[in-house]
Amino acid sequence: VQGTLGHTNYTFIGDEFNFSFTPEQLFSNRIVQNLTGTAEGGPNWVEFLTGCGVEDGLHDPRECDVQLWDFAYAGANTINEAGFTPLHHNHTVSLERQIEQFVSYGNPALESIHLNKKKALVAVWIGINDINDLVSTQGKNATFAPSYEKIQDRIFKSVEKIYDLGYKDFLFVNLPPLDRGPGTPKVNASMVSSFNEIHSAHANAFQNQHKDVKVLQFDVNSVLNSVLDHYQDYGFKNVTDYCPGYNQPDILINPGKYGCTELDTFFWYNSGHLTSRTHEIMTKVLRKWLVKQ
């Protein structure tokens, strides 16, 4: 989610070199919605889910019926550790650092406006960069389970810090079917399955350790595999590749210039992201599922 005070194309607020922020800065910040406002070419799942920042333009999260406060960083891995997964940019904020940032600056600001933590849902969806980077640096014949365990261990140690602040409702989303994507030929279905199984085991353990918490695990992998299996029912024309002109300023009005049909007819936005249309489809399923929980 792009913010007016964020690093362009990467974040809602700040970066590794601008790590701290004041409540005044956070509340003057606005969600930016346009072609480059997300990594999907349009609204993403948290914007669709909350209804906050869906329309083009600038949006104040406090004026949304469901407020959206996004502290994720584009291109982030879970762990910032030399020799494990590479830092994509020197300004990248890893998940561990994102949560440090939230604990130190985000939560105090939200407490200052009396955010009702009993009505807050903490959502965590990470792992695409982790699994891709591990196979890129170690090779597809490596044994990845220990690395996946390490990642999940660090995720939930960080989530523990959010729990300690008084948040009790958590949503975790597993990896999508990267094995069927255009940019990840080295990532196979067994890797994705292993990563997701280890993730689920850690989420279950977190639930068992905290009886006062509600842990929700959304299986987006199954949802999107089903969409891919029946893609024509959703209006998709291309589910194996992405439009090479996806990030061009005139792509929405002239996709044919790049040899493409409309972006909404593509499942994949680029080698590592789903289109906004795919996010919209999965979020409809997610919303119905959440209501039943």
What is each residue range found by the language model?
Residues V1-Q293:
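Conserved active-site regions of diverse hydrolases
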